[in-house]
């Protein structure tokens, strides 16, 4: 069967990674080298994790729900350190279980997804939220008005990324679309621009457009898995 031969990897890259907009992530050079000097070394590992995750999903006839709720991933020592996970040593890739208890699990916890939907120096709740809305849920937003001001690449002093976005999104002509996508992104603010969990707690509580209150990746995953899939 095709799902048990080398073509499975091509399916993982050409279908799954293409669908998630992470194909070719191992060549990504969008991050600020001064802020994230480790990124150039890690991006290949981050991409390999995603490919192996999808290879495993296909080989085991995983469901759409497994995309969100999978409790395992594949790590080597270098990527495990980025994730703050002990017990993985060397270059050999290992299947690691219990990812939900470690604050990750499924595609929402993949560093490729979190990093590709961030800026060079800061996170982007708008990009992350739009990715959930359009890529995972298959919804579509109208194009933003042409005269919308660009957000700064770095967060101004005294503001968090969330506060910056909330200020931007309060503009009346922008609010209608942003209320649909931004809350999904706010729920993922515990992760920095390269998909690493922040050392300090971040407010990830948010209210979706339909009034549902969620908190963090766990709350977002539960909502998507039970209400939207």
Regions found by a protein language model. Give the residues of each.
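A cross-family structural signal marking well-folded subdomains
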Residues: 1-131, 142
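Sequence context surrounding c-type heme c attachment/ligation sites in exported
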Residues: 77-80, 95-227
């Amino acid at each position: 069967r095709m799902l048990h031969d080398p073509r499975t990897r091509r399916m993982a890259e050409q279908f799954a990674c293409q669908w998630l907009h992470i194909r070719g992530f191992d060549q990504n050079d969008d991050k600020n080298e001064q802020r994230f000097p480790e990124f150039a070394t890690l991006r290949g590992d981050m991409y390999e994790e995603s490919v192996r995750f999808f290879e495993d999903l296909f080989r085991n006839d995983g469901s759409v729900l497994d995309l969100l709720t999978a409790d395992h991933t594949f790590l080597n020592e270098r990527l495990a350190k980025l994730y703050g996970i002990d017990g993985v040593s060397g270059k050999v890739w290992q299947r690691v279980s219990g990812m939900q208890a470690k604050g990750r699990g499924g595609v929402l916890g993949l560093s490729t997804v979190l990093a590709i939907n961030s800026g060079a120096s800061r996170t982007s709740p708008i990009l992350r939220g739009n990715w959930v809305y359009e890529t995972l849920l298959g919804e579509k937003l109208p194009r933003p008005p042409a005269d919308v001001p660009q957000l700064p690449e770095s967060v101004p002093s005294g503001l968090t990324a969330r506060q910056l976005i909330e200020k931007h999104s309060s503009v009346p002509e922008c609010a209608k679309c942003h209320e649909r996508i931004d809350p999904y992104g706010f729920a993922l603010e515990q992760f920095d621009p390269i998909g690493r969990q922040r050392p300090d707690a971040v407010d990830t509580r948010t209210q979706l457009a339909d009034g549902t209150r969620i908190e963090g990746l766990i709350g977002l995953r539960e909502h998507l898995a039970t209400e939207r899939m």
